[in-house]
Regions:
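Amphipathic alpha-helical binding modules
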Residues: 89-134
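Intrinsically disordered, low-complexity segments used for protein-protein interactions
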Residues: 12-13, 25, 125, 129
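Charged, amphipathic alpha-helical linkers/stalks
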Residues: 19-31
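Amphipathic alpha-helical interaction modules
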Residues: 34-95
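Alpha-helical protein-protein interaction elements
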Residues: 3-6, 56, 63, 119
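Short acidic, low-complexity intrinsically disordered linear motifs used
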Residues: 1-21
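Compositionally biased, low-complexity repeat tracts
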Residues: 5-8, 74, 80, 98, ...
């Protein structure tokens, strides 16, 4: 199946692609304003999602990804304050697994957030996250 291209839009004339609109909506729902996330990070995120899904991700996949990005950017306290303890515990478990395995969509999202300087200092310290060349 051919992968569709994502689009930022152009001068208000051509609209943003569906995947970027869905990611923006999911980021807002996770209490991370989309304007705080660079467009390049959002584009890379939807491309990582497409790679993981083997095609277009379903709409229900965006909140899952947005929770990880919001947790990375807001830190544990900020995320919990906006999203509750249950969602905090779920995303913390996902981050722990991503750090331990170093593989998968969550690990790629954390690495993307680290390189984009979106990773909260408390998260870096608590989980010992760093990017090392091999």
């Amino acid at each position: 199946m051919a992968r569709t291209s994502s689009s930022f839009g152009f001068m208000g004339r051509f609209g943003r692609s569906h995947d970027l609109r869905e990611l923006d909506k999911a980021l807002r729902a996770a209490d991370l304003h989309p304007m705080l996330v660079p467009e390049g990070v959002k584009l890379a995120t939807v491309n990582l999602m497409k790679d993981a899904e083997g095609g277009e991700p379903p709409d229900h996949a965006y909140p899952y990804v947005a929770d990880m990005l919001a947790f990375c950017a807001l830190g544990a306290n900020g995320f919990a304050g906006a999203n509750g303890i249950e969602r905090l515990e779920a995303v913390e478990a996902r981050l722990t697994e991503a750090v331990e395995t170093g593989d998968g969509l969550d690990a790629q999202l954390v690495l993307l957030a680290l390189h984009a300087k979106l990773l909260h200092p408390g998260i870096i310290e608590e989980y010992g996250i760093s990017a090392e060349e091999q």
